[in-house]
Amino acid sequence: MLVYLAEYLTRFHTGFNVFSYVTFRAILGLLTALMFSLWWGPKLIERLQLMQIGQVVRNDGPESHFSKRGTPTMGGLLILGAIFLSVLLWGDLGSRYVWVMLFVLGSFGMIGFIDDYRKVVRKDTKGLIARWKYILQSLAALIIAFFLYTTAANPGETQLVVPFFKDVMPQLGAVFIVLAYFTIVGSSNAVNLTDGLDGLAIMPTVMVAAAFALIAYLSGHAQFANYLHIPHLPGSGELVIVCTAIVGAGLGFLWFNTYPAQVFMGDVGSLSLGAALGAIAVLVRQEILLVIMGGVFVMETVSVILQVGSYKLRGQRIFRMAPIHHHYELKGWPEPRVIVRFWIISIFLVLLGLATLKLR
């Protein structure tokens, strides 16, 4: 929004031209989201407490989690509010990339909000029925996938980038829709499964978003893209503002979500952030890289799949409890140890993912 104002003011003073630079707006976007989160956080937490919107804790979970019962949830509203404010202020509202991301965050955030509302306000322990949750997620993801496929302006927007191979970028055609769908829905649910400990999901999300900010910047410049053998995607630089807004909002939320948490993000936060990471990966053509950098999310999801599959096929559980972070809790690991070690794994995987840009 302010891009247009700055463009007009440039007529009177060339100093306003600085707002045309993506890097400058990205920094402002991060700071805006961070400061808004820190300012609004205490107010939102107090409001959630007054409304008695507290976390529901399973009776069959780790005993250490019983103390979390009643902790304010739906804190994802803080994250989404900070991201929307930052992107609307500093993003180019003429960019399709910006509107795609706002739609993803808004639609999946609404799905998560409905689920949280049913759980904590209407006291329905099941929340939004799984079937309906999946249908709504699928509908939103397919809308995005079809839109991106039908409005693709150059071949690079529908290619698949394969890490470690600089000349392997097959044209997907209509398969793009299928890949985009599974990436967005899968990432949304993966982050949702990971969000089980204080700060466990938000920090890897911040790390992956920061990495995608760099990739989006490189993809938007022909010289860098050609050097790294990745698709050149004109206009993708606007995704940098979205990514840094996620980083700022995430760090601001972590201020209140760090152990012991004052607030949880709820499904309104985890489903929307996960879908956002998936959508960014689709937009910059780095779906495989998301699997690498978001390895913690993949690990959590695979542990649930293996646990359920093993129990149904053999009648035996592989882990003491799934997702896998609960397995380590039941083994006696203190919650902060599990969290920090998963963060360390995430740092390693994000750096490994970035290294693949050059190792080709």
From Swiss-Prot:
One of its GO terms (biological process) is cell division. It is found in: Cell inner membrane. GO terms for cellular component: plasma membrane. Pathway: Cell wall biogenesis; peptidoglycan biosynthesis. Keywords: Cell cycle, Cell division, Cell inner membrane, Cell membrane, Cell shape, Cell wall biogenesis/degradation, Magnesium, Membrane, Metal-binding, Peptidoglycan synthesis, Transferase, Transmembrane, Transmembrane helix. GO terms for molecular function: metal ion binding; phospho-N-acetylmuramoyl-pentapeptide-transferase activity; UDP-N-acetylmuramoyl-L-alanyl-D-glutamyl-meso-2,6-diaminopimelyl-D-alanyl-D-alanine:undecaprenyl-phosphate transferase activity. Its main location: membrane. It catalyses: UDP-N-acetyl-alpha-D-muramoyl-L-alanyl-gamma-D-glutamyl-meso-2,6-diaminopimeloyl-D-alanyl-D-alanine + di-trans,octa-cis-undecaprenyl phosphate = di-trans,octa-cis-undecaprenyl diphospho-N-acetyl-alpha-D-muramoyl-L-alanyl-D-glutamyl-meso-2,6-diaminopimeloyl-D-alanyl-D-alanine + UMP. It is a multi-pass membrane protein. Catalyzes the initial step of the lipid cycle reactions in the biosynthesis of the cell wall peptidoglycan: transfers peptidoglycan precursor phospho-MurNAc-pentapeptide from UDP-MurNAc-pentapeptide onto the lipid carrier undecaprenyl phosphate, yielding undecaprenyl-pyrophosphoryl-MurNAc-pentapeptide, known as lipid I. Belongs to the glycosyltransferase 4 family. MraY subfamily. This is Phospho-N-acetylmuramoyl-pentapeptide-transferase. It comes from Shewanella oneidensis (strain ATCC 700550 / JCM 31522 / CIP 106686 / LMG 19005 / NCIMB 14063 / MR-1). The gene is mraY.
